[in-house]
A protein has these predicted regions:
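Short, solvent-exposed loop/turn elements at beta->coil junctions and helix N-caps
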Residues: 65, 134-139, 165-166, 203-208
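Short glycine/proline-enriched turns and hinge-like loops at secondary-structure junctions
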Residues: 71-72, 141-145, 169-174, 211-212
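Flexible, small-/acidic-enriched active-site or ligand-binding loops
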Residues: 146, 196-215
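A structural signal for short hydrophobic beta-strand segments in well-ordered beta-sheet cores
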Residues: 149-152
């Protein structure tokens, strides 16, 4: 068994490590780098993301045909390990949850039309996204089969009724993937933050920092 990384991946790994050391880790000791929820502040994030793009390290998990690096699991693991040496790392490379998982889902199953409208803006860093799945008890948490939110088709449109919580990034997201029950089972719906009929009731505090995580 060969435990060595291919040369092209190892070069990207080293490049990622050097970028994190030079541009990201030093920010952790600067109080103004943080927002009120202990994430990297949005202005600084935008600046670092521009540098990542210039270095050719943006969205390594996305196919080259959609402006990513097109890495497979081994390459992604190598680069993600380096990014996660900083709590700010994953989000700077567009590799933080929930965007990371949402991009993967959309790239796998969305139609081309849906990809252009919903996926590409996330890939480009123009918008952020969230996954609305978890519900208060007795609704679905880690078990989606328990989801209580219902969607019914009425007069040519879908009407969704339910309550979700612990929706990571909902406050800054523009694109949402929402899971609801239909007569055929669970269905994932795409919606934009500006669509009417929904609202955020409150931000739920948690124990510890809310820093962006990576997969």
């Amino acid at each position: 068994m060969d435990f060595y990384l291919p040369d092209n991946i190892d070069k990207l790994r080293i490049k990622t490590r050097n970028f994190v050391d030079k541009h990201i880790i030093p920010l952790e000791s600067v109080p103004s780098s943080y927002d009120n929820h202990e994430n990297i502040n949005e202005t600084l994030l935008s600046e670092i993301r521009d540098k990542v793009k210039l270095e050719g390290l943006w969205s390594p998990q996305i196919p080259k045909s959609r402006s990513g690096l097109g890495l497979g699991p081994i390459g992604m693991a190598a680069l993600y390990e380096e990014m996660n040496r900083s709590i700010f790392g994953p989000v700077c490379f567009n590799c933080a949850a929930p965007d990371d998982g949402n991009m993967y889902i959309l790239n796998k199953i969305a139609t081309e039309e849906q990809k252009v409208e919903w996926l590409d803006p996330i890939i480009n860093g123009d918008v952020r996204s969230s996954l609305a799945m978890t519900e208060p008890a007795p609704g679905g948490g880690s078990d989606p089969s328990m989801i209580k939110t219902e969607a019914t088709y009425q007069n040519g449109k879908w009407r969704i009724n339910g309550l979700k919580w612990y929706i990571t990034g909902a406050g800054v997201a523009s694109h949402f993937i929402l899971l609801a029950k239909t007569k055929d089972g669970l269905t994932a719906f795409l919606y934009h933050k500006d669509q009417p009929g929904w609202n955020i009731k409150r931000r739920i505090p948690i124990m510890g920092p809310e820093e962006h995580g990576g997969h």
